[in-house]
Amino acid sequence: MFKNAFQSGFLSVLYSIGSKPLEIWDKQVSNGHIKRITDADIQSSVLEIMGQNVSTTYITCPADPNKTLGIKLPFLVLIIKNLNKYFSFEVQVLDDKNVRRRFRASNYQSTTRVKPFICTMPMRLDSGWNQIQFNLSDFTRRAYGTNYIETLRVQVHANCRIRRIYFSDRLYSEEELPAEFKLFLPIQKS
């Protein structure tokens, strides 16, 4: 999808405020919902993914299972709200051995397991809004001893609220981020 696009800085694949936030995503829902709502904490539109079973309610990008993202930027950033329920996300990458590897992070696992094609790992979320920064290059090297080439697919499972999902060429400090990539919490009146 993005293979022939110039990639530097930031590349957003989901923005909850956009007119069609799931335009390049496919949705799977079983005993749950995927809808845009207004989050009370940030007083803004977010995408809520809720489901009885984490594995059967999710969004995946790209929507076409025969296509790949082709994103070479090595940092994946998710701005996610912890709903204090089971939650996971998955990223499929291509390495320099031409092998497709998956990384799955979840808040219900306690140990990291590395198998030939999938690495599952625990993730701890703070209460409320979180910015998850995932160094794909580093994880590929540490788990498999190979080099990251590109991201093929991203999948986000229930249960969470999403503000934005983007890729970047490096980690940026809060001051360096463009305003639309920051999560602003409204000022509380006392």
Curated annotation (Swiss-Prot):
Induction: Up-regulated during flagellar assembly. Belongs to the CFAP20 family. It comes from the Eukaryota. It is found in: Cytoplasm, Cytoskeleton, Flagellum axoneme; Cytoplasm, Cytoskeleton, Flagellum basal body. InterPro entries: CFA20/CFAP20DC (IPR040441), CFA20_dom (IPR007714). Cilium- and flagellum-specific protein that plays a role in axonemal structure organization and motility. Involved in the control of flagellar beating in an asymmetric and planar waveform. Stabilizes outer doublet microtubules (DMTs) of the axoneme and may work as a scaffold for intratubular proteins, such as tektin and PACRG, to produce the beak structures in DMT1, 5 and 6. Not essential for flagellar assembly. The lineage of its organism: Eukaryota, Viridiplantae, Chlorophyta, core chlorophytes, Chlorophyceae. GO terms for biological process: axoneme assembly; cilium assembly; establishment of protein localization to organelle; positive regulation of cilium-dependent cell motility; regulation of cilium beat frequency involved in ciliary motility. Keywords: Cell projection, Cilium, Cytoplasm, Cytoskeleton, Flagellum, Microtubule. Disruption phenotype: Exhibit erratic movements with cells continuously turning around the body axis. Display longer and sharp kinks flagella. Flagella beat in a uncoordinated and deformed non-planar manner. Lost beak-like strucure projections in B-tubules of the outer doublet microtubules (DMTs) 1, 5 and 6. It holds the Pfam family CFA20_dom. It comes from Chlamydomonas reinhardtii (Chlamydomonas smithii). This is Cilia- and flagella-associated protein 20. One of its GO terms (cellular component) is axonemal central pair.
